[in-house]
Regions:
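Short N-terminal edge-element motif at the start of the domain
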Residues: 1-6
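Charged, low-complexity intrinsically disordered regions
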Residues: 7-13, 21-129
Length: 129
């Protein structure tokens, strides 16, 4: 076997992305954000506090108490959630997971939908100005 070809193939890790249409690169500094969570417990881990950090969208997301209550249950299964603007859209995604753990709960889908709603409304406000 050649030194340049590793003995393994592609790793079976996947990441779920949700995309909001629009040119996010124009407002990149305002739209980039991620969650930071504080957990307690080892065996029965739970999220005790969380906050969004990043651009101005983080302030809007921090102000939504309904989203915060959804995130306290979802962040344990999804890991940190990030918002990343690109030229063709704004990506919303969680951590990498092994392919056998790719399961989307109803609460996770509601959470991503709520985040996408905030991003979409904020992006429309920015483009109207």
């Amino acid at each position: 076997m050649s030194e340049s070809n590793p003995a393994y193939g592609a790793l079976p890790y996947l990441q779920t992305h949700f995309v909001v249409a629009g040119n996010g690169r124009i407002f990149e500094d305002r739209l980039i954000a991620r969650t930071r969570k504080k957990t307690k417990g080892v065996i029965r881990k739970q999220v005790v506090d969380l906050r969004w950090e990043g651009g101005q969208i983080a302030d809007r997301l921090n102000g939504d108490s309904n989203l915060k209550s959804l995130l306290t249950t979802v962040l344990l299964e999804e890991g940190d959630i990030r918002i990343d603007p690109t030229e063709n859209g704004i990506r919303i995604y969680g951590d990498w997971k092994p392919e056998y753990k790719i399961v989307m709960s109803k609460q996770a889908l509601e959470t991503y939908n709520a985040i996408a709603g905030h991003v979409k409304s904020y992006l429309s406000e920015l483009t109207r100005k």
